Regions:
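Cytosolic-side membrane-entry/anchor segment at the start of a transmembrane helix
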Residues: 1-41
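Alpha-helical transmembrane segments of integral membrane proteins
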Residues: 44-151
Length: 151
C-alpha cells in the first residue's frame, strides 16, 4: 500500500476514534444534565442511591474519556518526536547514531505504554457509561414502584 493510502487510512481511523470518544463524553454530559433536571425539586432519600451511583459512573466515564484524549495527544506528540529523532533533526539527539538509537527506543516504549493506557481508558469510558445507565434505570424503576405504592 502506498504511503498516501496508509496516511489517509490512519487519518480516518484517528478521526473516527476521536469522534467516538467525544460522542461518549457528550452522552455522559447529557445523562448527568437529564438526571439533574429530573431531580431538581427532589429531596434526598435512600431511593436515590442508585441515581448517585449512576452519576458517579458517568463521572468516571467522563474522567476516562478525558484521560484517553490526553494520552492520544501525548502519543501523537511522541510519534512526532520519534520522526524528528529518526531523521536526525531533533535538536537534542542530532545525528549521533547511538543517541538516536537510545532516544528512539525510549520513545517507542513511551508510545507503547501510552497505547496501553489509551486502550484501558477507552474500555473503562464505555463500561462506566453503561454502568451509569443501568443504575439510572434501576433508580427509575424504584421511583416508579414508590409512586405506584403511594397511591
Amino acid at each position: 500500500m502506498p504511503d498516501k493510502e496508509i496516511i489517509e487510512l490512519h487519518r480516518q481511523l484517528r478521526t473516527v476514534q476521536d469522534k467516538y470518544t467525544y460522542f461518549l463524553l457528550a452522552v455522559v454530559a447529557a445523562a448527568v444534565a437529564f438526571a439533574v433536571k429530573l431531580t431538581i425539586d427532589s429531596t434526598l432519600s435512600f431511593s436515590m442511591i442508585p441515581l448517585g451511583v449512576a452519576i458517579i459512573g458517568w463521572g468516571l466515564s467522563f474522567f476516562c474519556g478525558c484521560r484517553q484524549l490526553n494520552y492520544v495527544s501525548s502519543t501523537i506528540y511522541a510519534n512526532y518526536e520519534l520522526l524528528r529523532v529518526q531523521k536526525g533533526i531533533h535538536p537534542e539527539a542530532g545525528a549521533n547514531t547511538q543517541i538516536v538509537a537510545a532516544a528512539s527506543e525510549g520513545i517507542r516504549q513511551a508510545i507503547e505504554s501510552n497505547s496501553n493506557k489509551i486502550s484501558f481508558f477507552a474500555k473503562w469510558q464505555f463500561r462506566f457509561l453503561i454502568a451509569g445507565a443501568l443504575f439510572f434505570v434501576v433508580w427509575h424503576i424504584i421511583e416508579m414502584i414508590m409512586r405506584t405504592t403511594n397511591k
